[in-house]
């Protein structure tokens, strides 16, 4: 499943090369936010690679490198020299991984094209041999997507393949004269540097599309924990070669047509959160929590509810020790998938403060959600900014004061069949306020 277009058909190496750098980089957004975004991208890339979905993995690795190029030119760069140097070390590792993956990605795309051409030839031959008829010709269309959610969402699909080293993407091969801070390696040949993190080429053993076949997954029992397909362990000499992991299908898209990967939300999360923050709610103080989880087979699973250190009023709340939060997330290899907060006495909506807060979450991860709990009204809602209209409105907003209106519709409720699905699954609550 291609995360760029939400389809099974892969893009070419050249196509994804041009798209890897095609994202908005707003210098008005604090550099610390972009650096955190880079960490999110890197984590996702390595999940895809570990699941043998090399095309999505290499796309994200290249976007990780592209983002580094832009971060160097951010107005706050001078204040983040150490962080940028650490980022550069990550880029070196990413480039080495790209070089190892490149031949596999190219071969997979070539195999896909050969299979597609063969199928097209068969269709033409079939149409040619058919008898003339006054009836309308048969239309070859895909089966309609099932509207009802089911674990048929999970199917084995050949990994979409790309080629990221196109002539148009050689901007990453800039010389050290263009980038005075760093000696950026060339992408045209295998790197000659020593990486801090050794990478075994056995991780990228070639996987033939012809070796893949559909496998029916075990059904998901709502009364049991989420079950993931296990990744095969293999070495260079292992037989048979590893097959691609199952992939959760895309069911929702942004207003701009970009695919949104599904987020699986524990049904008990809202109730658990209200129970944890009840003391603050009684004092008419807002409380927020961070929704953390894992990326598995092209879908996100919320596994942790983290309550960070924070300060709050009746109308606002904000974290005060982000370093501890990030340390916990990195230690457990968790992604930030959104946030949840209360409106103790108000109704369920997104205030202007909420919109600006959520903007940073959604820039970091397009699928990120905001859950608002209004206990006094016994209501709740799951929201996201409209993309691109609402997101750009908030990014460009320079209105003074915490509370101010925004023109037009800025956000929407994530309604079925949106990209959020509630399921019976375990949830771990971590309260960082407790020492």
Swiss-Prot record:
Region (Disordered): 162-185
Keyword flag Phosphoprotein: yes
CDD domains on file: MPN_AMSH_like
Pfam family, one: JAB
Keywords tagged on the record: Cytoplasm, Endosome, Hydrolase, Metal-binding, Metalloprotease, Phosphoprotein, Protease, Ubl conjugation pathway, Zinc
Chief site of localization: cytoplasm
Listed InterPro entries: JAMM/MPN+_dom, MPN, STAMBP/STALP-like_MPN, USP8_dimer
Keyword Translocase applies: no
Low complexity composition bias: residue spans: 162-181
Cofactor list: Zn(2+)
Enzyme kind, highest EC tier: hydrolase
Any GO BP: protein K63-linked deubiquitination
Domain remark in the UniProt entry: The JAMM motif is essential for the protease activity.
Family: Belongs to the peptidase M67C family.
Name recorded for this polypeptide: AMSH-like protease sst2
Organism: Schizosaccharomyces pombe (strain 972 / ATCC 24843) (Fission yeast)
Gene: sst2
């Amino acid at each position: 499943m291609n995360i760029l277009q939400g389809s099974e058909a892969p893009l070419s190496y050249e196509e994804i090369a041009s798209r890897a750098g095609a994202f908005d980089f707003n210098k008005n957004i604090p550099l610390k936010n972009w650096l955190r975004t880079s960490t999110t991208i890197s984590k996702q890339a390595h999940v895809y690679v570990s699941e043998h979905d090399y095309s999505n993995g290499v796309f994200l690795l290249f976007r990780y490198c592209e983002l580094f190029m832009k971060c160097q030119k951010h107005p706050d760069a001078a204040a983040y020299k150490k962080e940028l140097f650490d980022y550069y070390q990550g880029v070196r590792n990413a480039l080495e991984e790209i070089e190892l993956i490149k031949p596999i990605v190219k071969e997979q795309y070539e195999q896909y094209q050969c299979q597609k051409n063969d199928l097209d030839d068969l269709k033409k031959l079939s149409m040619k041999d058919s008898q003339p008829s006054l009836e309308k010709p048969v239309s070859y269309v895909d089966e309609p997507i099932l509207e009802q959610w089911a674990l048929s969402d999970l199917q084995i699909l050949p990994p979409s393949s790309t080629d990221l080293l196109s002539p148009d993407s050689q901007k990453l091969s800039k010389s050290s004269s263009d980038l005075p801070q760093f000696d950026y390696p060339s992408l045209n040949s295998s790197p000659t540097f020593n990486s801090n993190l050794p990478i075994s080429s056995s991780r990228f053993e070639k996987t033939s599309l012809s070796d893949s076949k559909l496998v029916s997954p075990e059904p998901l029992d709502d009364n049991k924990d989420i079950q993931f397909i296990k990744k095969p362990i293999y070495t260079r000499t292992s037989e048979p070669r590893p097959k691609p992991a199952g992939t959760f299908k895309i069911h929702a898209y942004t207003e701009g047509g970009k695919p949104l990967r599904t987020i699986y939300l524990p049904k008990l999360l809202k109730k658990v959160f209200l129970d944890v923050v009840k003391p603050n709610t009684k004092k008419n103080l807002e409380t927020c929590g961070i929704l953390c989880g894992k990326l598995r087979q092209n879908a996100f699973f919320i596994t942790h509810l983290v309550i960070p250190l924070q300060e709050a009023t009746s109308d606002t709340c904000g974290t005060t020790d982000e370093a501890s939060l990030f340390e916990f997330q990195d230690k457990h290899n968790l992604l930030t998938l959104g946030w949840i907060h209360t409106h103790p006495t108000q109704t369920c909506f997104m205030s202007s403060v909420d919109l600006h807060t959520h903007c940073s979450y959604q820039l970091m991860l397009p699928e990120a959600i905001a859950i608002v709990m209004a206990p006094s009204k016994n209501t709740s809602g799951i929201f996201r900014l409209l993309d691109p209209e609402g997101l750009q409105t908030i990014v460009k907003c320079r209105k003074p004061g915490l509370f101010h209106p925004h023109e037009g519709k800025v956000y929407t409720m994530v309604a079925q069949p949106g990209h959020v699905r509630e399921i019976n699954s375990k949830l771990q609550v971590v309260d960082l306020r407790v020492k």
